[in-house]
């Protein structure tokens, strides 16, 4: 909150909305989308951070390319003795459609930007891996997401984000692919295996 207030004092177009209690990530993101009056929507998890020009550069890309969904490359990092340890940057493909995404969840939530009017009534469902479900539903509308061409997102790896939850994530990936992506039994097996493999390839076991 202190960091947000610093930015609010510098920019009069920033609004901060307080919740009386923690209602979860999905509720907060859906509320932000509903209250937003901007042309584009971006999300930044509290563990992650952006380079200073991330939003400006990405908006310029969206305006020039006329894309409704974009993302950036990103660099994973973790904390060791309060020091940031950076891993190899994840270079995301130039273009990603729905079929590609469900086999490799390579779009970091904190890296993406979506045209608000395109989101429409799509919401983050109140499930584990709500960001995977949301991005799947956006891409299923028929758009092709595009790489904005810069590495401006830094994604923090925590114990909760990877290995300690791998079995839970497999379960919810299976559930989302069945309910939202309407994949066949074999399609769900393929998706879960490829997502698991690509996650290990990008982040390792840390």
Residue positions per predicted region:
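Short alpha-helix within the catalytic core of nucleotide-sugar-dependent glycosyltransferases
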Residues: 1, 30, 38, 51-63
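Acidic donor-binding segment of Leloir-type glycosyltransferases
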Residues: 1-18
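Glycine-rich, basic loop-to-helix element that forms the pyrophosphate-binding segment
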Residues: 18-36, 57
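Conserved nucleotide-sugar donor-binding catalytic segment
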Residues: 34, 92-172
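Short aromatic/hydrophobic "clamp" motif used to bind/position activated sugar donors
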Residues: 41
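The conserved acidic donor/metal-binding loop of glycosyltransferases
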Residues: 45-49
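Conserved donor NDP-sugar-binding/catalytic core segment of glycosyltransferases
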Residues: 53-85
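Non-catalytic, C-terminal membrane-associated alpha-helical segments of glycosyltransferases
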Residues: 145, 151-152, 159-206
């Amino acid at each position: 909150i202190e960091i947000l207030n610093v930015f609010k004092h510098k920019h009069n177009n920033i609004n901060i909305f307080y919740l009386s209690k923690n209602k979860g990530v999905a509720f907060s993101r859906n509320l932000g989308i509903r209250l937003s009056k901007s042309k584009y929507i971006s999300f930044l998890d509290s563990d992650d951070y952006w380079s200073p020009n991330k939003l400006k550069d990405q908006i310029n890309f969206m305006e020039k390319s006329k894309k409704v969904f974009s993302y950036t490359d990103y660099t994973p990092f973790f904390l060791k003795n309060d020091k940031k340890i950076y891993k190899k940057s994840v270079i995301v493909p130039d273009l990603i459609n729905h079929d590609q995404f469900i086999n490799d969840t390579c779009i970091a939530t904190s890296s993406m930007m979506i045209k608000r009017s395109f989101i429409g009534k799509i919401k983050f469902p109140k499930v584990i891996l709500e960001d995977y479900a949301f991005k799947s539903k956006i891409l299923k509308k028929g758009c092709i997401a595009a790489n904005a061409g810069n590495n401006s997102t830094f994604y923090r790896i925590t114990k909760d984000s990877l290995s300690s939850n791998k079995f839970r994530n497999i379960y919810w990936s299976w559930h989302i692919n069945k309910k939202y992506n309407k994949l066949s039994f074999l399609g769900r097996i393929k998706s879960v295996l490829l997502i698991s493999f690509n996650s290990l390839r990008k982040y390792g076991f840390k």
